[in-house]
């Protein structure tokens, strides 16, 4: 038994397949830079925190790690959340892939007081509870728009902040 597919449905399927192939080709040609959780004890850690650990902190950590690597900085960024989501939205993964990046972690991870204490710096998009941050100094970036509504504006605001941060850091000698 064969199901008839309308002309409009065939066109939509072809368009979807074409876009998927174009995205795959772009990733292959450009390459996807991966930045995972720090595995070296020799690197200082910067922590980016957003409420759910799934969007802004992921974007900031991924872009920070790219910039730090390009500039030879002995620092790695991680993404953390307060009330973490179960997963990173597909739209954010796709937009990061379009930037040649992947999220800083596979799934959102909650910030612990130990991580806050060990971080050389914490940047947050949302309030970090006092019992988690302890004595750690937190710099808040409240001017970043919602990335799920306007990824480009959010990314550009984050990257502007990151440029200011990395300019103050010394490159690895």
Kindly label every feature range from the protein language model:
Residues 50, 126-127:
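Glycine-rich, N-terminal phosphate-binding loop of Rossmann-like dinucleotide-binding domains
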Residues 28-32, 127-173:
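Phosphate-binding/catalytic loops
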Residues 16-28:
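Bacterial N-terminal signal peptides
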Residues 120-122:
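Conserved acidic residues
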Residues 1-11:
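N-terminal secretory signal peptides that target proteins for export/translocation
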């Amino acid at each position: 038994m064969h199901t008839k597919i309308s002309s409009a449905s065939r066109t939509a399927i072809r368009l979807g397949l074409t876009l998927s192939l174009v995205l795959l080709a772009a990733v292959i040609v450009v390459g996807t830079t991966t930045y995972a959780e720090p595995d070296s004890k020799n690197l200082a850690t910067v922590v980016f925190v957003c409420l759910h650990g799934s969007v802004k902190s992921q974007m900031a950590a991924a872009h920070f790690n790219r910039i730090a690597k390009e500039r030879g900085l002995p620092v790695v960024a991680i993404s953390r959340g307060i009330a973490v989501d179960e997963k990173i939205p597909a739209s954010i993964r796709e937009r990061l892939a379009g930037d040649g990046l992947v999220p800083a972690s596979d799934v959102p991870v909650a910030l612990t007081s130990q991580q806050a204490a060990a971080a050389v710096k914490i940047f947050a998009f949302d309030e970090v509870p006092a019992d988690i941050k302890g004595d750690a100094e937190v710099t808040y970036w409240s001017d970043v728009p919602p990335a799920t509504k306007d990824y480009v504006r959010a990314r550009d605001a984050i990257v502007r902040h990151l440029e200011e941060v990395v300019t103050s850091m010394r490159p690895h000698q």
